Regions:
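A Zn2+-metalloprotease active-site environment signal
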Residues: 1-220
C-alpha cells in the first residue's frame, strides 16, 4: 500500500530533518503502541491530511503541518490516526467492506451490479462513522494524558473543514430527495460523522476536564 501511494500520489517530505525529529519525539509520547511507525510525505493532490494504513503505519503530510497553528494541533490528528492503528480500524474496514461486497455480489448475481454495490456502500459508511467517533475519543484521552487540551483536535477539524478536507456544515443542511429536512439525511450517508458533531464531542470531553478514564479506555486496559 505504501509503495503504491509513493509511486502514484505521495511525494518526498520537504520538512527539515530536525522538524521531523521533533514531531516524531512528540508522537512517541502518545503511546502505548510501540509498533506504530510515523512517516513524513508531501501530500500532492491529497493536501493537508494524515493517513493510517492497515499495517499500522501513519503518514503525516507536510501540508497538514503547514496548516496547523501549533504542534498540539498536529498531535491531535496524530493521536486520532494512532487510535485507528491501535484498534486495527484500517484492516477491519478493509475486511468488512470486501466481505460485505462479496456476499452482496453473490446474492444479487451478475445481472444487478447496482444492488450489489449500493447496500455495501451504505453499510460501510455507517461503520466508518462509528470508527471515526471512536478514534476521536481515544485521541482525546491520549491528548489529555499528555496535558494537551483535546480541543486542539477540534480546532484542526475546523481548519480542515475550511479547506474542504472534511464534511462541511453547509452539506448537513441540504434537502433530502424526499424534500425532508436534512441534517440527519446527509450525516447518514456520509462516510464520516459530521464535522460539527465531532467538534462538539471533543469540546464536551474537554469541558469535563478530559482527565478521567472513559469506560472504553478501562475496558482496553
Amino acid at each position: 500500500t505504501l509503495s503504491l501511494l509513493d509511486q502514484r500520489i505521495l511525494k518526498p517530505s520537504a520538512l527539515r530533518a530536525a522538524r521531523q525529529q521533533a514531531l516524531l519525539e512528540r508522537f512517541r509520547q502518545l503511546g502505548p503502541d510501540r509498533g506504530a511507525r510515523l512517516l513524513f510525505r508531501g501530500g500532492g493532490r491529497l493536501g493537508a491530511n494524515a493517513l493510517a494504513l492497515p499495517d499500522g503505519t501513519i503518514i503525516l503530510l507536510d501540508e497538514l503541518v503547514d496548516l496547523a497553528d501549533n504542534d498540539d494541533q498536529v498531535l491531535g490528528v496524530l493521536a486520532h490516526e494512532m487510535a485507528h492503528a491501535e484498534q486495527n480500524h484500517g484492516l477491519q474496514a478493509l475486511i468488512e467492506s470486501t466481505a460485505v461486497g462479496a456476499f452482496l455480489a453473490w446474492w444479487a448475481g451478475d445481472f444487478s451490479p447496482l444492488i450489489a454495490t449500493a447496500p455495501a456502500a451504505l453499510l460501510q459508511a455507517r461503520h466508518s462513522r462509528k470508527l471515526e467517533s471512536e478514534a476521536d475519543m481515544i485521541a482525546a484521552e491520549k491528548l489529555a494524558r499528555m496535558g494537551i487540551d483535546p480541543a486542539r483536535l477540534a480546532e484542526m477539524l475546523e481548519k480542515l473543514e475550511a479547506q474542504g478536507a472534511a464534511p462541511s456544515e453547509n452539506s448537513e443542511r441540504e434537502t433530502s430527495p424526499a424534500g425532508e429536512s436534512t441534517e440527519k439525511w446527509s450525516d447518514f450517508l456520509s462516510s464520516h460523522p459530521s464535522t460539527r458533531a465531532r467538534r462538539d464531542a471533543l469540546r464536551e470531553f474537554s469541558g469535563r476536564g478530559g482527565m478521567q478514564t472513559s469506560d472504553s479506555e478501562a475496558n482496553r486496559e
